[in-house]
Regions:
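Active-site glycine-rich loop that binds ribose-phosphate moieties when present
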Residues: 140-157
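A short, N-terminal "cap"/entry segment at the start of jelly-roll beta-barrel domains
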Residues: 1-88
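Short gly/pro-enriched beta-turn/loop segments at secondary-structure junctions
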Residues: 86-87, 107-108, 115-117, 159, ...
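Short, solvent-exposed cationic patches
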Residues: 22, 122-126, 151
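Glycine- and acidic-residue-biased ligand/ion/polar-headgroup-sensing regions
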Residues: 67, 95-96, 108-110, 114-144
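Conserved short histidine dyad/triad with adjacent acidic residue
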Residues: 73-77, 90-110, 125-130, 157
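Histidine-centered active-site/metal-ligand motif
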Residues: 83, 103-105, 172
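Conserved metal-binding segment of the jelly-roll/cupin
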Residues: 95, 152-174
Length: 174
């Protein structure tokens, strides 16, 4: 992606967060010079845990169709990293017509919360022991604490304000 495209997406993302009354941590607004003025020790958790902006087209060169914007506020980790947080918090922007590629997390339980902007559609499958898509067994998730059993590969739609808890090894794309 070209730097000019990344800068345009960053500005648009900041505007969207503002329109939804979301504020980033103070370091989410720092200039390059403000980052450089900080010590590595002061920034260790942010850098080690890969927190902050992530604008990706998944190396496919088609951001408008296969891409997304993330701002990682907290990132789950194991005690070995020195930052024992078995959870993460990420603000994500997926535009109409965009797709976040299918993936799962080995160790993290994930809450996906639609904070606003439109309906979020997720396709859900379990992972088999060999990490292939399980097309045979139902998917159990909790939507705002309410247990739902879905067919494998079902599309779950979340309206603004709704959330879903995805267990470990749950394939999802949105």
């Amino acid at each position: 992606m070209k730097r000019s495209e990344i800068n345009r997406i960053l500005k648009s993302s900041e505007d969207f967060f503002t329109s939804q009354n979301w504020r980033l941590p103070v370091w989410g607004y720092w200039t390059w010079d403000e980052w450089l003025a900080r010590s590595a020790l002061e920034l260790d958790e942010i850098l080690t845990q890969e927190m902050g902006w992530d604008i990706t087209d998944f190396a496919l060169g088609d951001f408008e169709r296969k891409g997304m914007v993330l701002f990682t506020v907290r990132n789950g980790s194991t005690p070995a990293t020195g930052y024992d947080k078995p959870y993460c918090e990420k603000l994500m922007i997926v535009n109409d017509g965009q797709l976040c590629l299918t993936h799962f997390h080995w160790d993290k339980v994930e809450d996906i919360i639609n904070r606003g902007g439109g309906t979020l559609n997720l396709r859900l499958n379990n992972a088999n022991a060999d990490e292939s898509l399980d097309m045979a067994n139902p998917v159990v998730v909790y939507i705002d604490g309410i247990r739902r059993v879905l067919d494998p590969g079902a599309v779950l739609s979340l309206a603004p304000g709704e959330s879903v808890t995805l267990p470990q090894r749950n394939y999802h794309s949105f």
